[in-house]
């Protein structure tokens, strides 16, 4: 808001004119006093006769000067009275009223300026507070967004770790089940191995019994062969080294259990279709290969 400041003349032209008149009157009075004062004069012996007339003249002149001075003083007093009356008249003149109106307008303008400055200051304060609140909200929003991003990343990491933990738990369960299966299989194999071991021990015991049973037969056959001669040797050989009771082609080398008949060859003894002994028709539980080479 632009305010045009008017320079007010606190002293009117009438004040200046009266002051100049008083000043000129004073100068004139001073000039008359200086003119009436005279100059110093040097008087000799020859001129002593003129002193008395001069003194008398001076006395008369001083009386005239005093009279004129009193007149001037009275004139000055009258002029001062007239000037004071004029000043009083000027104080209540329309010009003084105009000056008072100007002063009131200036005061009003100053009050308006102060009010405008106060209003602008309040507006600026409100704007600064609003801007500060906006910046505070923006900062809080930025901090909140950063915190939310970090929390979201942590939540995603927690979910990922939970999935990984679930996968590991499933893997542990599978490993546990697999371990249990392998343990059961190991126990089954161990039981099978123990059963096979016991069966093998039984077979070995039966083989020992078979060897003990064959030894007297072989000795008797040898004795019979030595006593009967070469004509009866074929029959003894057929008894001792008889062929397979099933195919009749190969030499019997498989002992059938539990009847203990040595009546099958290697091929027939390995067949899964043979379930009974071909000699006594007893159910065959096992078979043992016998090495007939001497």
From Swiss-Prot:
Quaternary structure and partners: Interacts with the DELLA proteins GAI, RGA, RGL1, RGL2 and RGL3.
Keyword DNA repair: no
Pathway: Protein degradation; proteasomal ubiquitin-dependent pathway
Organism: Arabidopsis thaliana
Domain comment quoted from the record: The RING-type zinc finger domain mediates binding to an E2 ubiquitin-conjugating enzyme.
Catalytic activity: S-ubiquitinyl-[E2 ubiquitin-conjugating enzyme]-L-cysteine + [acceptor protein]-L-lysine = [E2 ubiquitin-conjugating enzyme]-L-cysteine + N(6)-ubiquitinyl-[acceptor protein]-L-lysine
Annotated segments matching region WRD domain: 168-204
Zinc finger (RING-type): 244-281
Protein name per Swiss-Prot or TrEMBL: BOI-related E3 ubiquitin-protein ligase 1
EC number: 2.3.2.27
Enzyme category, top tier: transferase
GO BP terms in the entry: defense response; proteasome-mediated ubiquitin-dependent protein catabolic process; regulation of programmed cell death
Record's function text: E3 ubiquitin-protein ligase involved in regulation of abiotic stress responses. Not involved in ubiquitination of MYB108/BOS1. Has no effect on the stability of the DELLA proteins.
Keyword Zinc on entry: yes
């Amino acid at each position: 808001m632009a305010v045009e400041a008017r320079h007010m003349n606190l002293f009117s032209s009438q004040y200046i004119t009266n002051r100049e008149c008083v000043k000129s009157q004073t100068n004139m009075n001073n000039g008359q006093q200086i003119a009436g004062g005279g100059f110093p004069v040097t008087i000799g012996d020859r001129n002593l006769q003129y002193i008395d007339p001069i003194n008398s003249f001076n006395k008369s002149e001083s009386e005239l000067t005093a009279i004129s001075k009193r007149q001037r003083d009275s004139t000055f007093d009258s002029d001062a009275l007239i000037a004071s009356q004029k000043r009083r008249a000027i104080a209540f003149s329309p010009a003084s009223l105009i000056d008072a109106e100007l002063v009131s307008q200036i005061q009003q303008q100053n009050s308006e300026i102060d009010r405008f400055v106060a209003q602008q200051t309040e507006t600026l304060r409100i704007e600064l507070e609003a801007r500060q609140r906006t910046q505070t909200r923006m900062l809080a929003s930025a901090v909140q967004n950063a915190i939310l991003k970090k929390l979201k990343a942590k939540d995603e990491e927690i979910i990922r770790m939970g999935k990984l933990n679930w996968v590991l738990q499933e893997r542990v369960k599978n490993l546990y089940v697999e371990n249990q299966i392998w343990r059961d299989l190991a126990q089954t194999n161990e039981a099978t191995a123990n059963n096979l071991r016991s069966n093998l021990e039984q077979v070995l015991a039966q083989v020992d019994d078979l060897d003990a049973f064959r030894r007297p037969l072989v000795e008797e056959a040898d004795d019979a062969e030595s006593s009967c001669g070469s004509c009866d040797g074929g029959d003894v050989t057929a008894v001792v080294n008889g062929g397979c009771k099933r195919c009749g082609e190969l030499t019997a080398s498989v002992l059938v259990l539990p009847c203990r008949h040595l009546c099958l060859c290697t091929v027939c003894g390995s067949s899964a279709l043979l379930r009974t002994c071909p000699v006594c028709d007893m159910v065959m539980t096992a078979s043992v290969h016998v090495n007939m080479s001497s």
